[in-house]
Each structure stands twice: as C-alpha cells, then as structure tokens.
C-alpha cells in the first residue's frame, strides 16, 4: 500500500447494507459501524467504497454519500467524480463515500444461512468494479462479518492487497450463549470464520474480550489482532437540558408520570427482550411499582418474533405494561434514549454493544448483561449496572432498585456521558488507518 496518500478502501458488507434501518432483520449495530467508520475515514482523506448485496431491483447501482469541498460546501456530482478518480485528494476536501449495490442472487432479502450460495456472484461483482478502475486502484480490502471475509479473501488475493477483517460476531461465541428458541450457528459459518481468520493480514476486534476470543477460539496470531474500539456520534447523542425527558416523552407519546425502561434492538433470542417482559411480570405479580417497558425494534430471524413477545406479555398479564414500537431513525433515536429512565440490554452475547454507548452518550444509565463487550462499555455502578445472568427475577430486582433510587440514577447519568466520551469515531478511524498500514507490511 502506498504511503504518500490516504488509502483507497474496498469495504465489504455483503449481508446487510449500511443504508438499511438498524433494528430489524439483519440490520443492527454493524450497519452503523460500517457507515460511521467509512465517513470518519473519508474525513481523513481516504476514498471508501462499500460493497453490499442488492436486495431490490430498484436500488441505485451506486449511492454517493456526502463529500465536502475545502470551503465546507457539499461536492457537486461532477466534483465528487473528479475527487474519486484523482491520484491525490485536494487539501481540505472530504471525499464522498460510495455504496455499491451488487447483484448477487435474487433481488430479495435472504436468510443469512442461504447467503453462502451467492458469494461467488458477489465476488464477481466486486472484481468487476475494480476492473473498471485503473490497475492497482484499491490499497486495502476491509471486510465485515464472515460472509464478507470470504469475498474479501478472493478480492485481496486477486488485487494483491492486504485483507483486514472485522468479525463483529463469532459463531463459536454465539453457540456457547444460546437462549431458549435460538438456533445454533451452522458449521459452514464456523469453518468460514476459521478460514477468514487464517487468511486475513489483520483482524480488528472491538474489545479486548473479542481479541482474546479470536486467539483462544480461532487460533488467531495475537500479533495480527488489533483492538479498535468503535465510536459514537457524540454530537447527535448527547444529554438534553432541563425538561428534556418530559419533552421527549410528549413527542413520542409516552406517559410523563411513570418510569420508562427502554430496550432498543432486534427482537430475537440473542438480544433476550423476553427476559425484560418476564421481569416486568415479576414486578407486577409482587405488587411493586411497574415501569413501562418500551421495546424499540423489529423481528430478526423469525417473522413472528414480535407477535410472540406480545403474546408473552398477555400471558403474564402485563400487556398494558409493554409497548412495542418499530425501529427509530437515527435522528429520532436520541429522543427515545432521553425519554427513558433506564436502557436495558439483557443480551446473551454482544461483541461490543453500540446501543449501550449511544444511550450513555445521551445521559441515560444502562443495565446490561455481564457478557462480552458490554463488560467493557458499561462501568458497573458508574454508568449503570452489569447484571449477572438472565434470570428475570434478578433483572426485576435490579430494575426495581434502580428506579427506587433517584440520586443513584442521577450519578449514573453523569457517569454515563463521561464513559461514552471515550468512544469517538475520529479516534477509531486513526487507529484503523494504522492497522491498514501494518497489514500491508510483509508477514
């Protein structure tokens, strides 16, 4: 990789587009990660092109995002094209990020277990894109999730450039943390991950926990594993002023006279929203104050997941205490965090936990399962609580204790913002650029 200019990056996100709405289907924290990292790298002069599988026939072949000239004005289409094709990015210019929708398989969303069958088509589409450029155009391939890693290994070998891989989640970790009704990850994924770990010139882990899992469970060379903590948009996600909570609740149609606990994420066994519904049931049965539980998310995996969660609430007699809303756009999400007294994450596995960081940046304490990356991003009794296990009785006690102690919640809220301020995309981008440079060195 040349060192006299910022790199040209082929970023792969095969199974989900960074433009998709997080919180339903396969869209989640990884979508946010890819998009935010791409923008942060572009702000440092890198030219980033994201390749994702086209799931509809009516999506544009290429979407051009942002791009700013030296005076801070948005680039015109012609200027954006000139910047993308130039040898060097002019000083003060932020190049646009491109998102390419690659036809591979049917124009529809596919279950992740069916996606290995379209990887050859995806690889061919990525290689065709490079063929339209000058030879040696890309400097590095950065793949996200194991499916992208399979395509990335082919592209990196063909272009003779380094492969950097971010797993986001790992099958062996998930299979050790299955919840009721959850399905084990197939062996094809386990083998695929092992191949990518062996092929990659550098592996990016979000936390020291994930780095250790890559080494201990997948035999990764510790020298090739780099911990780069993701960032959070600290301008978008920040505490409101006096009265912000009630204002957010009125805007969102939530009561102002009742505690609110928020779950934001996909409705699936891995995220365990059922634990929170059962915890509300425990509180209702015990006669203690019961918060309103807001589940902000859509189904992932089973289309019936939301209906099943509502049915559980009815069975437990807490259907009036549980509200399910669809995923919120990014600009609206901060209002949901501000509206909540607590954000709860009873996940059975999390490689990082972006929701926890966003909530803390918004000044909202987090109750998180004591698992994976959540142990890193939530500081126990500083920005919330780390809750052992997934027993609804335990979660009910922790929720009740937190809601009954307003001074402690106020202390947590202040600590939450301080914890979140450690996570900045600018820092993450700088560290990833260093990883790209290291990956280009001979092994």
Swiss-Prot record:
Its EC number is 2.4.1.250. GO terms for biological process: mycothiol biosynthetic process. It comes from the Bacteria. InterPro entries: Glyco_trans_1, Glyco_trans_4-like_N, Glycosyltransferase_grp1, Mycothiol_biosynthesis_MshA. Transmembrane segments: none annotated. It catalyses: 1D-myo-inositol 3-phosphate + UDP-N-acetyl-alpha-D-glucosamine = 1D-myo-inositol 2-acetamido-2-deoxy-alpha-D-glucopyranoside 3-phosphate + UDP + H(+). Pfam families: Glyco_trans_4_4 (PF13579), Glycos_transf_1 (PF00534). 1D-myo-inositol 3-phosphate binds at residues 15, 26-31, 112, 145, 169, 189. It is an enzyme of class 2 (transferase). Mg(2+) binds at residues 337-338, 340, 364. UDP-N-acetyl-alpha-D-glucosamine binds at residues 21-22, 29, 266, 271, 350, 358. GO terms for molecular function: acetylglucosaminyltransferase activity; D-inositol-3-phosphate glycosyltransferase activity; magnesium ion binding. Keywords: Glycosyltransferase, Magnesium, Metal-binding, Transferase. Homodimer. HAMAP family: MshA. Belongs to the glycosyltransferase group 1 family. MshA subfamily. Catalyzes the transfer of a N-acetyl-glucosamine moiety to 1D-myo-inositol 3-phosphate to produce 1D-myo-inositol 2-acetamido-2-deoxy-glucopyranoside 3-phosphate in the mycothiol biosynthesis pathway. This is D-inositol 3-phosphate glycosyltransferase. The gene is mshA.
